[in-house]
């Protein structure tokens, strides 16, 4: 079976939560016999196709942007051409240009949309985009939400409940670098033996300005890994508040990130807006057995982190509540250890890449069978899928 994924950006050009989901999905479904290709846009000059983790990556030039919406004239032809060769076209939403490209390329193959997030911030543009968005979502064969929380709370998905299902994101720990003793020693010396960790792109909805406000009056080390649009403002805020115990590391290699995930006392994830639909770095914390602190925003973050069980969940945009959660975990190491152990157990039960891959491969098969029952009867394009645990 051949699956074409379409998203605005991907490895090696960018590293983010959705890119990690697509990567894990491709790695997992490849093991089940799926041939994956990712079509994305890039600003790089060298756009030769590459192989990455066992799947193909094809990049088209990013020509221009409208309200942060990446566009490519060449991608229209590429999508039309590559869709003809695919058994299933897998779209990753939101990306308004993708909706337009779907119609302009006249894609006539089984289609699935991974609905990664509502569009939250661009209110003015959203009004103009609404008709295209709903025409696109109505036209595809299946929509997938990453958590029951998001499916229940999204007003957009409520219109498409009859063709929407939940397949949770999953991670494969074996795809992460192993523990490097030298890097562990380096970071232990640099940040100390006990610290809270945040990992992610420094965006407006990550709530890091709230975390910095919560850190005022505490002396607990907090390590913030990543870069992004809010980096300068956050560093200025930390300096203004005199937060000498907060370390901004910038972008790090995966080996360093893994070392910090191994060493961290707990994971702080203060995202306060629905743009944070799931939280891959929160799931990474669970995978590494860390107690978590997150906010209740009606999304997948509270499906990963169960208040009082795997960590603490506080109201969004509430520095005092966040400060209290940091203090509770810091002052109760036995509680933190127990929560971390339960977080890892929940990851193993619900969030492995094997489960995600099995769910999506079964969906691909279902879509192909509905579109071409004769081929399905002959076994063309289908693979055997083990039952999800």
Give, region by region, the residue ranges found by the protein language model.
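N-terminal strand-loop element at the rim of the active site
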Residues: 6-15, 21-69
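Short hydrophobic beta-strand element within catalytic cores of glycosyltransferases
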Residues: 287, 291-295
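A short, active-site helix/loop in glycosyltransferases that binds the activated sugar's phosphate group
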Residues: 138-178
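Short His-centered aromatic/hydrophobic patch
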Residues: 91-98
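Acidic donor-binding loop of glycosyltransferase active sites
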Residues: 87, 196, 262-277, 290
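Conserved acidic donor-binding segment of nucleotide-sugar-dependent glycosyltransferases
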Residues: 306-308, 312-319, 328-333
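A conserved mid-protein helix/loop that constitutes part of the nucleotide-sugar donor-binding site
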Residues: 20, 194-217, 229-235, 358
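Nucleotide-activated donor-binding/catalytic signature segment of Leloir-type glycosyltransferases, i.e.
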Residues: 235-255
